[in-house]
Amino acid sequence: RTYIIFDVIAKYLKENEGFDVFYLQNITDIDDKIINRAKERKTSPLKLAKYFEKEYLKDMKGLKINSVTKYARATKHIKEIIGQIEKLFKKGFAYRIDDGIYYDISKFKDYGKLSRRTALQAEDAVSRIDESKEKRNKGDFCLWKFSKPGEPSWPFDSSLRSSN
């Protein structure tokens, strides 16, 4: 449903309002779900991610969703992702705990404005993935999960590894 809505909006803006729309869509090709399912299926996370990406693109074609200008795989932009997280960390919007780096929703006064929810209301929206009891606020979300032994990993700047 989400992709259909974005496709309709992009097409409307392009065809009816004359906007030059550049629609970039993320392809998450590595995360805990992919790693766990790859282990279950005795395959590599990369192979599994490519399989699901192929299936997803077939579905998009079948639904005639064709307004996406470019797809960006997360693993192809690790340096940029780390750079953005480092900026948030240095500005005090992110913090480190044992399992990863989290965004502190209480630091952004307009957090939830688009969804008409306050940071306190977001406390109710605890993610299945980000249930860590170490989080400062229940609504804080994970920006980066640290890898477990045997999982793919990417190095962070030493200032992030040593800071709390």
Predicted regions span which residues?
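NTP-dependent nucleotidyl-transfer catalytic core
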Residues: 1-164
